[in-house]
Amino acid sequence: EQIADLAAYHSLFYSQSKVGHKPATGASYGLSDQDIPLRPLVKVHPVTQRPALFIGRHAYGIPGLSEAESEALLERLTAFACQPPRVFAHTWQPGDVVMWDNRCVLHRARPYDYAKPRVMRHVRVAGDPITEAGIIA
């Protein structure tokens, strides 16, 4: 309830800059012509009606909080979300397929051997693009 009315900006450029990447000309990932979206920290799943944290490495800048307060709160929420029993780490085997509901899962890549090929596919199978984006008007 303490964070139910809070929101944060979400930007690929923000998350990439935190790990040392600099945006290059033409490397906007299709986002350069859009405003940075403001999304709620908590989003209610449209099917289960369960609240879920809507955070991740792209989230920053909670309106009403200082930069330091915003970063500290997001770090605490991420640390909470990424602890057992709320963590699944898949041990990949050839032929594996993993699917998840992006509306209620915080996911990230783990270190892997760059010399070995990886094939990934992203498919939206359900949901309204407007409400799924969680953008606050």
Regions from the PLM with identified roles:
Residues E1-V97, N102-A137:
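Non-heme Fe(II) oxygenase catalytic core, chiefly the N-lobe of the double-stranded beta-helix
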